Regions:
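Alpha-helical interface subdomain recognition
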Residues: 40-42, 59, 66-213
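Active-site PLP-lysine loop of aminotransferase-like
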Residues: 4, 32-33, 72, 149
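Long, acidic (Asp/Glu-rich), low-complexity accessory segments flanking structured domains
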Residues: 44-63
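A short core secondary-structure module
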Residues: 1-26
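Solvent-exposed alpha-helices and their adjacent loops that cap or buttress functional pockets
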Residues: 5-9, 16, 32-35, 56-57, ...
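Short beta-strand-to-turn element immediately C-terminal to the catalytic PLP-Schiff-base lysine
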Residues: 1-3, 16-18, 42-44, 55, ...
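Flexible, small-/acidic-enriched active-site or ligand-binding loops
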Residues: 18-47
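Short coil/turn connectors at secondary-structure junctions
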Residues: 9-12, 37-38, 50
């Protein structure tokens, strides 16, 4: 995406830049999302032919939002996948770990936590699937996508946090996978638009008033 004039939104277009002299990248290390690379990209005196214009200036934001309507629910589902793994680990741990003569799953506090975690995951999944079904039907889905992204990633982070609590001191050690899951799930609240941005988008749709600034 490149800016072609000073119009905040209308001046943006999409161009395809081929690797050539003046194109440089440097990797950026992250706390999570390491299955995909993140890098700083520098263009120094790079020339791009007009034929490499993929989306004309003024149309890029529309194309971006169409893309985000499909990708935001997917981000939610990825985060909820981590949460599901954390729940599975917590169930096993609660069944195996004993205190006061019985598995900790037999204590009301732990049992209630597990029930709440499972419910949050299922609610997040349903919201994501609703948004994606709208995409499949060709319906406008930007609000559902924003709701899905915010709620799903928020619930996922809460679930993984509770998983760490259930594991107690073991949860912060690298001997148990919830430590890694805790780091892995947090970036989902930032990627594809922060959760704060999602809330503003939802609020604008409800009131018709833009509070972005």
């Amino acid at each position: 995406m490149a800016r072609f004039n000073d119009d905040p939104a209308g001046g943006l277009g999409l161009i395809l830049v081929e690797r050539q002299h003046g194109y440089q990248t440097s990797d950026i290390e992250k706390m999570g999302l390491n299955s995909q690379s993140t890098a700083q990209v520098v263009f120094q005196d790079v020339r791009v032919p007009k034929t490499n214009m993929m989306v004309a200036p003024g149309e890029a934001m529309k194309a971006l939002f169409i893309s985000l309507a499909g990708s935001r629910p997917l981000v939610s589902l990825m985060a909820l996948g981590v949460a599901q793994a954390a729940l599975d680990e917590s169930i096993r741990y609660a069944q195996d770990r004993s205190q006061f003569g019985k598995p900790i799953a037999g204590h009301q506090l732990i049992s209630a936590k597990l029930g709440e975690m499972a419910t949050k995951i299922e609610a997040g999944k349903l919201l994501a699937l609703q948004a994606l079904s709208q995409v499949d039907r060709g319906e406008r889905s930007d609000v559902s996508a924003a709701m899905s992204k915010w709620f799903g990633t928020q619930m996922a982070c809460e679930v993984v946090g509770e998983a760490l609590q259930i594991h107690g001191g073991n949860g912060i050690t690298k001997e148990y996978p919830v430590e890694y899951m805790y780091r892995a799930v947090r970036p989902f609240m930032v990627t594809e638009g922060t959760n704060e941005i999602q809330k503003l988008s939802i609020g604008r749709a409800l009131t018709g008033i833009d509070a972005f600034g």
